Amino acid sequence: MKNRREFLKQSAAIAGFAWLNPLMSQFSFAGNMTMIRGNVGYYTERGGTIGCYLTKDQSVVIDTQFPEQAANMLAEIRKVNANKINLLINTHHHGDHTAGNIVFKDVVDKVVSHENCRINLEKTALAQNALDKNLLADTVVIDKASFKLAKESVECRYFGRGHTNGDIVVHFENANIAHLGDLVFNRRFPFIDVPGGASIDQWIETLEKIVKYYDKDTIFICGHANEKYPVQINKSDIRAMQNYLDKLRIYIKQQVKDGLTEEAVIAKTTIIPGAEEWTGDGVVRSIKAGFAEYKTM
């Protein structure tokens, strides 16, 4: 049973959270919509985490999962805002982040992505004869781009190759919340998209730049997490992801040096030594990506 001090402490925390997120006290969102602060939050259902900025007058959506999930997210937005969405931003081109774009076709003013994201998405759509089922960016980012809203500034910044060759970080500057897309998989084996321009070496460097660029108070949203871990993270989680990639690099290079084949390493590996928090399915993808990058070193 809670004592009075614990009760008052919890009540104060809830009150403070509501103050940071006035929308929470006015509207009833679905359980998979979480507002963090400064009218910025995220939506989870199936696929990569959707980020959002939401007021009665303006809104921003980051990534869209799949059409059904995008429609559900749009319904949440419509509880607050009936206006056109100001910005739809894609962190990268993968289908679990972009397949829902088409749902926003007639209700968004501007679609933004890195130039390589647009190239990759168009290439994939054409290969699948599905260009009409996709919504491509009309505004592309090369190094950085900023967008001004009434009460928020949104910066999209490219730090370099990582999960693909077109990953951007989207920073709500006033709220000081940054959506990382799939540059961080929180304690979950990552997809390292070699055909899409991924590089383990470059990913490690990209994460270093991110850690140094944002301040100690920045809250981060990542695209995926182990079911035991959150998608709302901090710099220590980015460092943990960086450590995973570094330990993967060390491990694969040693296996190559020892003369082991990719198949032999897959057969014997369930975790990456030095990054034991990463468990479950998916280590095979990391091994394959590692061999693609380091087998001819």
Outline where the language-model segments fall.
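Conserved beta-strand hairpin/beta-sheet module of binuclear metal-dependent hydrolase folds
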Residues: 34-76, 170-171, 176-182
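Active-site metal-binding motif and surrounding structural segment of the metallo-beta-lactamase
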Residues: 57, 68-112
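Active-site neighborhood of phospho(di)ester-bond hydrolases with catalytic His/Asp-centered motifs
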Residues: 62-64, 86-94, 112-114, 179-181, ...
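Metallo-beta-lactamase
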Residues: 117-160, 164-165, 173-174, 214
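C-terminal regulatory/interaction regions
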Residues: 260-297
